[in-house]
């Protein structure tokens, strides 16, 4: 349910863009994100830090887009959010010596420290690459291409990357693992 609440503002943004324009869509994104945040608070009495950072960026860059009537601000939002996430992940790993990924998922999963480090670094690189691709699409391709990329491209690639990370995590979960056939046949 929580992921659905996080996804609704994106759907509202896309619909408003298709029906009206980028400026109505930016205002709708601000309103939908605020509403999503309020509903999340009412349902769970907790809001994740990443959600608060995203909300703040939506308000700041969405408002700048509306005030200056310039879509560059809303286009930069994606890259700046992803850059902040990447920096936070890298600082947690290399400065704080505890990965954010482990801090978020460590209560549910038991993984070797090296796996946590690889996952954390992989997500940091993922966010950096997505931010760079966003810059290219936002500034070199038509606005409609950027909107489709923001809504469908980034969502799709994030789901795919999450699935790949899930497979990677599954491979490293502790538990009874089958021995290779040669080892089984050698046992008395």
Curated annotation (Swiss-Prot):
GO cellular component, as recorded: plasma membrane
Membrane topology: Multi-pass membrane protein
Presence of the UniProt keyword Transmembrane in the record: yes
Pfam families, per the entry: IspA
Function: Plays a role in cell envelope biogenesis, maintenance of cell envelope integrity and membrane homeostasis.
Presence of the UniProt keyword Nuclease in the record: no
HAMAP family: YciB
Signal peptide: none
Record's subcellular location: Cell inner membrane
Keywords: Cell inner membrane, Cell membrane, Membrane, Transmembrane, Transmembrane helix
TM segment ranges: 22-42, 50-70, 72-92, 121-141, 149-169
InterPro entries cross-referenced by the UniProt entry: YciB
Protein name: Inner membrane-spanning protein YciB
Family the entry assigns: Belongs to the YciB family.
């Amino acid at each position: 349910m929580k992921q659905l609440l996080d996804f609704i503002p994106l759907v509202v943004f896309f619909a408003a863009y298709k029906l009206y324009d980028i400026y109505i869509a930016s205002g709708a994104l601000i309103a939908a994100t605020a509403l999503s945040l309020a509903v999340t608070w009412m349902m769970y009495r907790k809001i994740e830090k990443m959600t608060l950072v995203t909300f703040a960026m939506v308000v700041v860059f969405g408002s700048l887009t509306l005030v200056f009537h310039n879509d560059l601000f809303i286009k930069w939002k994606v890259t700046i959010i992803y850059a902040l996430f990447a920096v936070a992940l890298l600082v947690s790993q290399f400065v704080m010596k505890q990965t954010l990924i482990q801090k978020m998922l460590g209560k549910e999963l038991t993984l070797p420290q090296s796996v946590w480090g690889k996952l954390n670094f992989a997500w940091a690189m993922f966010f950096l690459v997505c931010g760079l691709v966003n810059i290219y699409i936002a500034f070199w391709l038509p606005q409609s291409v950027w909107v489709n990329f923001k809504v469908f491209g980034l969502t799709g690639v994030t789901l795919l990357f999450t699935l790949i990370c899930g497979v990677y995590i599954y491979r490293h979960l502790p538990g009874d693992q089958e021995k290779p056939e040669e080892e089984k046949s050698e046992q008395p």
